[in-house]
Swiss-Prot record:
GO terms for cellular component: plasma membrane. Potential calcium-dependent cell-adhesion protein. Residues 792-805 have a biased composition (Pro residues). It is found in: Membrane. The gene is CDHR1. Coiled coil: none annotated. Its main location: membrane. Residues 24-705 are extracellular. The keyword Flavoprotein does not apply. This is Cadherin-related family member 1. The keyword Transmembrane applies. Keywords: Calcium, Cell adhesion, Membrane, Receptor, Repeat, Signal, Transmembrane, Transmembrane helix. GO terms for molecular function: calcium ion binding. It is a single-pass membrane protein. It comes from Gallus gallus (Chicken).
Length: 865
């Protein structure tokens, strides 16, 4: 029962499925015609130049029940697969390149399926032609044999080319390249090659012609563009010879020579003639027509001409022979002939070369002794040379030439006929130099000009030179630079200069001397050139560290040259630093340093660099000193006198320090000094006067003396000015009236209350002390009659101003020391420090070359010694 329940639903479903299957209809393609791009691909045409990968068609069909359909493409067995299809969309794509020339139709089986039924159709796709083929020549290569007597316009060959394209792309036309240079023409359609009208072929001029033929198709579409293809081939046209040209002599004109020693029967020359028809040449027969006069004969077959008489029997100097060359056919007939003229000259034998002669006969070596540098244009009269050629006419003509160092001498004459006297002339005097050549050697060459033998001969010429004093001694350098330490003992070597004179003997000996403003301390050895110091000389870099002077190199004839010597005296640490005073006193304001100074008289660093230090102080640890500048200041924690009072019980606030000045030389020198420092605080009294009073507080008479001296100078200046004005007016014989009155400006009460008993109130500028007013009563003489009242006496010189009044004060102001920053002035240096000048401050190792140029620039315009 259970199985029956399951069977009934299954049977029902099977019946429903059978009903549905029986009701299904097969799908089908749409037939849209030959020009349609969708359907079943029937009658589809594709150009062979369609690119691979192109979408060429769309399969399109439907199912009557409306079910979705799929598409397929299949091929016969062994066929190439040109297309692929998208099963769902039906898009057909070209996957293989088409070639109509190989396959012009493609069979494809297209199918459509709705999943239950499949419908297949076989369709043919036509491959359309595109112009993708070039013309091709057949039966190549083309070689044509053409007789040279072929008439113009005749056909000689037919050229054929094929193009596998159809239509205009397969049609071919022919033409020739370089048509203007060709002797041929071609029919454009048939390809028949002809000799151009009015043109003949000539084997003797050109045996082969190469004709380039171009075959071009009619053009057509290829991938959307019009394309025209062409091909070229070369036709070789060989011209065949025919007997149509007379013989030709080669090597004309013909010249022969019979010499005085020629034997009878000797061959003079050979003439050669060839048949003008080179392809099948005939034999040539030679004969002398006239001009021989029984003296010459010719070989009938070879063309060799021989003399049959002795040269002594020949009556003429020149013979003109007329020779005939005839073509002889194989049958023995003379078909053509030609003539040539042969010139034979009877000449003397060139059997004598040019020969050089001296005073005693033939000679091949000539010698001469002379001084160097003779004048240009001078003739070497010591050479007696004659040259001769015993032949006659052209055989006796030759050229002369000097072979050797060029441009020194020239020979006259250059061309000689038979005989001449040889003259050698100086051309370059400077090159005739004993120092370069002790002996000048040349070869005198004589060589024939117009003879085939070119006979020649040579003679050796040796010129021994004698020396003259033609050279100036020359230093090895234009300047010499030397260094020597100061304090070197007298007679110390400084530098050695060297000069050479290439002249020989005494002229080559050099003596040295020195002179110049800087040469006082130096001597030079006259032979060796060693420069050394005077025995008594003391070199001190602090006095002078630079010397320069000239050295002179002179030969025995007085010829000389100069060089400049630069000597630098190197500094040695030989001075100790020196303070300006052994015991110094300084007043120090709290917060302001005081400075000490010591001078080291050495010329160079580091010998003259001074370092300062405090050797001893009581109490210690109160002062600091700057090692380089010598500034002494209090420790940073000392800011008032109260702190100082706490340090020491000395209420005077005076300290004694032992300071040291030490140079940086090697070995080092040092100097010590005792310095007393009076410490005070800053007050309101400032300025130069306050500083002066502070310096002279212990010597009030000195202050009064200085003030009195200043006022006396002012009075003296006023009197001198007034006297000068008086004498000027007196010399002019009149005293001009004063038109402007100078009045003293009203002084205002000074607002300065500080140091009234020490200072004057000074205006801001000198012009504020006086004002100028015009005099109301002018003394001008309006009548111009010299009736002028006596001029008033000029005012007397103003008295010096009264001394300033002391400021009244009820309270006695406590004595305050103004701020004073003192420095020690160097004491007078006894070692000619002032003479040292600016040069002593320079570094002693300044470049000597730079100093040379500076000195030379400074001395420009002065005559050179």
């Amino acid at each position: 029962m259970k199985h029956v329940r399951h069977f009934i639903p299954s049977l029902f479903l099977s019946l429903v499925h059978v009903c549905l299957v029986q009701a299904n209809y097969a799908p089908y393609f749409f037939d849209n015609g030959a020009r349609s791009t969708n359907g079943n691909m029937a009658l589809l045409s594709l150009s062979e130049d369609t690119p691979v990968g192109s979408h060429v068609y769309t399969l399109n069909g439907t199912d009557p029940e409306g079910d979705p359909v799929t598409y397929g493409l299949t091929y016969e067995a062994g066929s190439r697969r040109y297309f692929s299809v998208d099963g769902n969309l039906g898009n057909v794509t070209l996957i293989e390149e088409l070639d109509r020339e190989k396959e012009d139709e493609i069979e494809v089986i297209v199918s459509i399926s709705d999943g239950l039924s499949t419908v297949s159709e076989k369709v043919r796709i036509l491959v359309m032609d595109a112009n993708d083929e070039s013309p091709e020549f057949i039966n190549t290569p083309y070689i044509v044999q053409v007789p040279e007597n072929s008439p113009s316009g005749s056909s000689i060959f037919k050229i054929e080319a094929v193009d596998r394209d159809t239509g205009s792309g397969g049609s071919i036309t022919y033409f020739l390249q370089n048509i203007h240079a060709n002797k041929f023409t071609i029919d454009r359609h048939s390809g028949v090659l002809r000799i151009k009208s009015g043109v003949t072929l000539d084997y003797e001029k050109s045996r082969t012609h190469f004709v380039v033929v171009v075959a071009k198709d009619g053009g057509g579409k290829l991938r959307g563009d019009n394309k025209v293809f062409s091909a070229t081939t070369t036709v070789t046209v060989n011209v065949e010879d025919v007997q149509d040209t007379p013989p030709m002599f080669i090597g004309t004109p013909y010249y022969g020579y019979v010499y005085e020693d020629t034997l009878p029967g000797s061959e003079v020359l050979t003439v050669v003639a060839l048949d003008g028809d080179r392809g099948k040449p005939n034999n040539i027969h030679y004969c002398i027509v006239n001009g021989s006069e029984g003296s010459f004969e010719i070989s009938n077959t070879t063309g060799a001409i021989s003399v049959i008489k002795s040269p002594n029997q020949l009556k003429k100097e020149v013979y003109e022979l007329r020779v005939q060359a005839s073509e002889v056919s194989p049958e023995g007939d003379v078909s053509a002939y030609a003539f040539a003229t042969v010139t034979i000259r009877v000449v003397d034998l060139n059997n004598h070369p040019p020969t050089f002669y001296g005073e005693s006969g033939p000679q091949n070596r000539f010698e001469l002794t002379m001084y160097e540098h003779p004048p240009e244009g001078e003739i070497l009269r010591g050479l007696k040379i004659t040259v001769n050629d015993s032949d006659q006419g052209a055989n006796a003509k030759f050229n002369l030439r000097l072979v050797g160092p060029g441009g020194i001498f020239r020979v006259v004459p250059l061309t000689v006929l038979n005989e001449a006297q040889v003259t050698i002339i100086v051309e370059n005097s400077a090159a005739i130099d004993y120092e370069k050549f002790k002996v000048l050697t040349f070869k005198l060459l004589a060589i024939e000009v117009n003879t085939p033998e070119k006979f020649s001969s040579t003679a050796d010429i040796a010129i021994r030179l004698l020396d003259t004093n033609d050279n100036v001694p020359k230093f090895s350098s234009d300047y010499y630079i030397a260094r020597i330490p100061e304090n070197s003992p007298g007679g110390s070597n400084v530098v050695a200069v060297t000069a050479t004179d290439p002249d020989s003997g005494l002229w080559g000996e050099v003596k040295y001397s020195i002179y110049g403003t800087g040469a006082d301390l130096f001597l030079i050895h006259p032979s060796t050139g060693i420069i050394y110091t005077q025995p008594w000389a003391v070199l001190d870099a602090e006095v002078n560290s630079k010397y320069n002077f000239y050295v002179k190199a002179e030969d025995t004839d007085g010829k000389y040259s100069l060089a400049e010597v630069f000597i630098t005296v190197l500094d040695v640490n030989d001075h100790s630093p020196e303070f300006n005073e052994n015991i110094q006193e300084k007043t120090m304001i709290i917060g302001s340093p005081v400075k000490i100074e010591a001078i080291d008289q050495d010329a160079e660093e580091p010998n003259n660099i001074v370092d300062y230090s405090i050797m001893q102080a009581d109490p210690a640890n109160v002062f600091d000193i700057d090692q380089s500048t010598g500034e002494i200041k209090l420790k940073s924690y000392i800011r008032s006198l109260d702190i100082i009072h706490n340090i020491t019980k000395n209420k005077d606030c005076i300290w004694s320090l032992v300071v040291q000045a030490k140079d940086r030389g090697s070995p080092s020198f040092s100097t010590t000094a005792v310095l007393k420092i009076d410490i005070t605080e800053e007050t309101l009294h400032k300025g130069p006067m306050a500083a002066f009073l502070m310096q002279t507080k212990d010597n009030p008479m000195k202050a009064l003396g200085v003030l009195a001296g200043v006022m006396g100078i002012m009075v003296l200046i006023t009197i001198m000015i007034s006297t000068a004005m008086f004498w000027r007016n007196k010399r002019s014989n009149k005293i001009m009236p004063v038109r402007r009155i100078i009045k003293k400006r009203q002084t205002q009460q000074s607002r300065t209350v500080r140091m009234e008993w020490l200072k004057f109130k000074r205006p801001s500028n000198a012009a504020e002390k006086f004002v100028v007013e015009d005099d109301a009563k002018s003394l001008q003489n309006e009548n111009s009659n010299n009736n002028v009242q006596a001029a008033p006496v000029p005012p007397a010189a103003p008295l010096p101003p009264p001394p300033p009044a002391l400021a009244a004060s009820g309270n006695t102001t406590a004595w305050r020391v103004p701020t004073v920053s003192g420095s020690l002035t160097p004491k007078f240096i006894n070692k000619q420090l002032k003479k040292r000048g600016h040069s002593s401050t320079h570094n002693a190792l300044v470049s000597e070359l730079k100093m040379k140029f500076e000195k030379r620039n400074a001395s420009m315009g002065e005559p050179h010694i």
